Structures are given as C-alpha cells and as structure tokens.
Regions:
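Charged, gly/pro-rich active-site loop segments
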Residues: 1-11, 80-143
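Short, basic/aromatic recognition patches
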Residues: 2-27
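A generic local structural motif
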Residues: 12-15, 39-40, 58-60, 113-115
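Short secondary-structure boundary/capping segments
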Residues: 17-18, 43, 63, 117-119
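A generic structural signal for nonpolar/aromatic side chains embedded in well-ordered alpha-helices
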Residues: 19-20, 65, 104, 129
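Short beta-strand segments
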Residues: 23-57, 63-65, 71-75, 85-86
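Short amphipathic alpha-helical segments
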Residues: 66-67, 142
Length: 143
C-alpha cells in the first residue's frame, strides 16, 4: 500500500488532543464579498469542542464574517507525524473578554509577554467556530 493510502482516518479531536494543545499557528479561511477566500494566520485555542480566535474588532476577518459567517480553520504539524485537523462551519461573533485574550496570548507568547500583550486593552472580537464538518489526519503509521 502506498504511504498516502495508509493514513489513519476517522480521527476525532480527542485523538488529536496533543496537537490541539500545542501553540501552533492556525489558518482561518473567510469569504470576501466577491466570493474569494482570505487565508489568515491566527492564534487560537481549542475549548469545549470548538475553536476560539481573538482578533481586533475592526479586522477584515470580522468584517467578512459579519457578511458571511462561514469559515474554516486548519491546524497542522510541520514535522512528523504530520497530524492535522480542519474544521468548517458557521461562526458566532462576540466581544472577547480580558480572560480569553490573556489565555490565548499567554499560550503563544508565554506568561510575561502574553500578559503584557493582553494588558494593552484591545477592542477584541471573539470568533467561535464549532465543527459543522471536520477532517483530521495522522500519518504516524506511515513513518
């Protein structure tokens, strides 16, 4: 069997807890007015079966999502075993409270720098994406 054909399938987010716990930069896809896709690197956290992304309220991603709430996000490893997850669905937008901003900033920048970033008091929007569809992969058995 070729390497691609042996990929483990039917994975769930629970199978990928280690991956989702890592501070990997995700890619968020939103739709422009003309239907083109905008791909944006984002910080995220996986919580309660969905992704939280925080961005400034006036960001282009938020403008897109107000017009069209469909989005996808992908998180993946750049080294073996090349695990990843893609989630698509409709987002909910809300105000990001200080605790969410701090949690995500500390996740990516560490305690001191993340705290300093969060203390700047941004006007942030919380983008919440729960799976409408999910695709996950893991090439561990192939390597």
């Amino acid at each position: 069997m070729n390497k691609i054909g042996a990929m483990r399938k039917n994975l769930t987010p629970d199978d990928l807890d280690g991956l989702l716990a890592r501070p990997l930069v995700a890619v968020l896809a939103t739709y422009r007015d003309n239907g083109d896709v905008l791909l944006s690197p984002v910080w995220h956290r996986w919580r309660d079966g969905g992704f939280d992304v925080v961005t400034r309220g006036d960001d282009v991603k938020v403008r897109h999502l107000r017009e069209d709430p469909r989005a996808s996000i992908v998180v993946f490893e750049h080294e073996p075993p090349y695990r990843g997850i893609e989630v698509g669905g409709r987002v909910e937008l809300g105000r990001a409270d200080a605790d969410v901003v701090r949690d995500i900033a500390v996740r990516y920048l560490g305690g001191e720098e993340g705290g300093a970033y969060a203390d700047q008091g941004h006007d942030d929007t919380l983008i919440r994406l729960e799976p409408g569809r999910l695709r996950a992969w893991d090439f561990a058995d192939d390597l």
